[in-house]
Design a protein with these regions (language model features):
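A shared catalytic/ligand-binding motif for oxyanion handling
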Residues: 1-200
Length: 200
């Protein structure tokens, strides 16, 4: 982990340097900026890879009911040379880290997951005895009709561990707007996932 101090803004960066080599040097990786006024309540959870940062928000410091874990993730595209070369499965890594926190952990996962889920709403697994909450009563909107390999991995992740997809389910984005705009089209590949009952 590399830490960069941005004192002029009162921010500290938690950065993971990329492991991908390009022209003999590293590139990629992710960074999260934390304001100095809250750094005492934020701690970093160790991870194996270079594309996942997990921060723990201390419940006492933030006056929360439970400790909350913020996952910041980047998943290299499934067909990228890096993914092919390393046989990397980012969703297995995310699932393992969530499982290690236990079933009562409050989780918020944000990131560019390069997952296209199309109209697949199977991410919301409800047992027969489930009492409906507000999120579950809304079908998830998604303006991106395409589903790719990572889309299937993401919905499988949501069935095996608590977080559910909030894109297209919350006020402000009930239609599931596009999150990526390029010269050759638009897609929804950036996500917000949260544990059931998380107040976001």
């Amino acid at each position: 982990m590399t830490s960069i101090n941005c004192n002029f803004l009162g921010l500290n960066a938690i950065k993971l340097a990329g492991k991908k080599k390009k022209f003999g040097r590293k590139h990629g990786g992710i960074a999260v900026f934390v304001h100095e006024s809250i750094t005492k309540g934020v701690s970093k959870i160790p991870t194996k890879g270079s594309d996942l940062i997990i921060l723990k928000l201390d419940r006492m410091f933030f006056n929360l009911m439970e400790d909350t874990y913020l996952f910041f993730a980047y998943c290299s595209p499934a067909n990228s040379s890096y993914t092919q070369r390393t046989d990397n499965d980012p969703f297995s890594e995310i699932e393992e880290n969530i499982s290690n926190l236990g079933t009562n952990a409050q989780i918020l996962l944000l990131g560019d997951l390069n997952a296209r889920t199309g109209e697949d709403n199977s991410d919301l697994f409800l047992p027969d005895s489930y009492n409906t909450d507000i999120v579950a009563t809304y079908p998830r909107g998604n303006r991106d009709p395409v589903k790719n390999q990572y889309g299937g991995s993401l919905t499988s992740l949501c069935k095996s561990v608590p977080p559910r997809i909030y894109n297209g389910r919350k006020l402000g984005d009930t239609v599931g707007n596009f999150t990526c705009h390029k010269w050759n089209g638009q897609s929804a590949v950036d996500y917000c996932l949260a544990s059931p009952g998380t107040n976001i």
